[in-house]
Amino acid sequence: MKLVTAIIKPFKLDEVREALSGIGVQGITVTEVKGFGRQKGHTELYRGAEYVVDFLPKVKLEAAVDDALVEQVIEAIEGAARTGKIGDGKIFVYDVEQVIRIRTGETGKEAL
C-alpha cells in the first residue's frame, strides 16, 4: 500500500477529486496549507502599500491506495492539477506499513 500526497493549487481541488473518484479512489483527506517552492511568493498592493506574500495558499490531499492503483492515481492528479504554470504543485508517494479501519477492525487492503 502507498500513501499518495499531493500539494496543488486550491482551485484545482474539485477537478482532482473528480479524477480520483473516476478511477475508484474511495477516500481522500484534504488539508488547507501554505508554502512556497520555486515561485517564492509574490508582492501584492493593498491600499497603496506593497506587501510581500511569502507563503502561498495550497491544498494538500492524501490518499492511501493499493499498490496496483498508484500509477493511475499519479496520472489522474497530474492531469487534473496541471496548468503548465509555476506553482502547480508536487506529488509524493510513501510506503504504508499498515492500515486499520477503527470501526470494524479490518486491516490491509480491506481497510482502504
Set out the residue ranges of the language-model regions.
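Positively charged, small/polar-rich N-terminal and surface patches that mediate targeting and assembly
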Residues: M1-L112
